[in-house]
Curated annotation (Swiss-Prot):
Annotated residues for binding of CTP: 221-222, 229-232, 259, 307-310, 336-340
Annotated tissue distribution: Strongest expression in liver, heart, and skeletal muscle.
Catalytic activity field: phosphoethanolamine + CTP + H(+) = CDP-ethanolamine + diphosphate
Chain spans, region Disordered: 1-20
Biological role: Ethanolamine-phosphate cytidylyltransferase that catalyzes the second step in the synthesis of phosphatidylethanolamine (PE) from ethanolamine via the CDP-ethanolamine pathway. Phosphatidylethanolamine is a dominant inner-leaflet phospholipid in cell membranes, where it plays a role in membrane function by structurally stabilizing membrane-anchored proteins, and participates in important cellular processes such as cell division, cell fusion, blood coagulation, and apoptosis.
Name of the top EC class for this enzyme: transferase
Name of the protein in its database record: Ethanolamine-phosphate cytidylyltransferase
Clinical condition linked: Spastic paraplegia 82, autosomal recessive: A form of spastic paraplegia, a neurodegenerative disorder characterized by a slow, gradual, progressive weakness and spasticity of the lower limbs. Rate of progression and the severity of symptoms are quite variable. Initial symptoms may include difficulty with balance, weakness and stiffness in the legs, muscle spasms, and dragging the toes when walking. In some forms of the disorder, bladder symptoms (such as incontinence) may appear, or the weakness and stiffness may spread to other parts of the body.
Highest taxon above the source species: Eukaryota
Location of Phosphothreonine modifications: T341, T342
Pathway(s) it belongs to: Phospholipid metabolism; phosphatidylethanolamine biosynthesis; phosphatidylethanolamine from ethanolamine: step 2/3
UniProt source species: Homo sapiens
Phosphoserine modified-residue sites: S338
Length: 389
């Protein structure tokens, strides 16, 4: 088990309100290519109780039931551990959720999104806990899925960027990516994510820097928020006893200017929620200027500016974007110790394209078969249904 506590520094489980026993909540899943949809599910689950335990499946279990994961189990454990609503991570959690698992970790109930998760033989992985009344459901986040993100990487288009309409070519490709012939699965495909102020409020901490805290500014694309970013932010967090980290996220067009191709894979709104979900980040500047200016440093009362070991690309006029913090002597480059980059993730997907398409087709076929069986069961007269006597 990996215990997180409620803050980045860790801590013990606290009693519930009024001194009552804390309500312990269980979630589990693959958590492959973790995005803000996963984070939102865990946020909702945490709100249903006082202490959230998240079980993460092994590579072997995922390959058996779904197909090869994009990230290794160690990478996935660390990504889930970095989500601020998670109190504890259980590595190598069983793929099928049982009462035995809930009892082992003293959990009152488990929470899952309102989509379906099936075993290799097409059975609902939550069947046992549902029958026992120890299952709760939360809303699935519309407009994002791992399938959609993989589709964006494979189809080199900028249609997903902010302020751009989704092209008919992109929509057709994303809707059909990995689908079995004739598939009409309500949980697969793509829809545009609609950002709202309420969603940002739900993800944000809402805390201002306090006296004695060190305000640290970092900036970048933070695209496909991944282990490399987490390792960097964790190292930055350790630079001060009481850090307050502000992450500046560049506009999509700015990122595309210095990254090229169809980057960023996730648009500014999506990247904002992904970064806000990280336990090491206190605040996000949405659409930060590429150059870290004197005005920005003064406005946020920045004590320290950090950048990773990746190349610092000059601004459009050829100037160093970190010229001002360097002049003030408050600039530091941090080695995250990770070699994972957004480019490497995209390369993994491209290299294993056929495997991922086959995986999604297999998943789609199982889910459609389950839906059809449920429809037929519901259409039968009561006395003829399985289990009715």
């Amino acid at each position: 088990m990996i215990r997180n506590g409620r803050g980045a520094a860790g801590g013990a489980e606290q009693p519930g309100p009024g001194g009552r026993r804390a309500v312990r909540v269980w979630c589990d899943g693959c958590y492959d290519m973790v995005h803000y949809g996963h984070s939102n599910q865990l946020r909702q689950a945490r709100a249903m109780g006082d202490y959230l335990i998240v079980g993460v499946h092994t590579d072997e279990e995922i390959a058996k039931h779904k197909g090869p994961p994009v990230f290794t189990q160690e990478e996935r454990y660390k990504m889930v551990q970095a989500i601020k609503w998670v109190d504890e991570v259980v590595p190598a959690a069983p793929y099928v959720t049982t009462l035995e698992t809930l009892d082992k970790y003293n959990c009152d109930f488990c929470v899952h999104g309102n989509d379906i998760t099936l075993t290799v033989d097409g059975r609902d992985t939550y069947e046992e806990v549902k029958q026992a009344g120890r299952y709760r459901e939360c809303k699935r986040t519309q407009g994002v899925s791992t399938t959609d993100l993989v589709g964006r990487m494979l189809l080199v288009t900028k249609a997903h960027h902010s302020s751009q309409e989704m092209s008919s070519e992109y929509r057709e490709y994303a809707d059909s990516f990995g689908k079995c012939p004739g598939g009409r699965n309500p949980w697969t495909g793509v829809s545009q994510f609609l950002q709202t102020s309420q969603k940002i409020i739900q993800f944000a901490s809402g805390k201002e820097p306090q006296p004695g805290e060190t305000v640290i500014y970092v900036a970048g694309a933070f695209d496909l928020f991944h282990i490399g970013h987490v390792d960097f932010l964790e190292k930055v967090h350790r630079l001060a006893e009481r850090p307050y980290i502000i992450a500046g996220l560049h506009f999509d067009q700015e990122v595309n200017h210095y990254k090229g191709k169809n980057y960023p894979i996730m648009n500014l709104h999506e990247r904002t929620l992904s970064v806000l979900a990280c336990r090491y980040v206190s605040e996000v500047v949405i659409g930060a200027p590429y150059a870290v200016t004197a005005e920005l440093l003064s406005h946020f009362k920045v004590d320290l500016v950090c950048h990773g070991k990746t190349e610092i690309i000059p601004d459009r006029d050829g100037s160093d974007p970190y010229q001002e913090p360097k002049r003030r002597g408050i600039f530091r480059q941090i080695d995250s110790g990770s070699n994972l980059t957004t480019d490497l993730i995209v390369q993994r997907i491209i290299t294993n394209r056929l495997e991922y398409e086959a995986r999604n087709q297999k998943k789609e076929a199982k889910e459609l078969a389950f839906l059809e069986a449920a429809r037929q069961q519901a259409a039968q007269p009561l006395g003829e249904r399985d289990g009715d006597f």
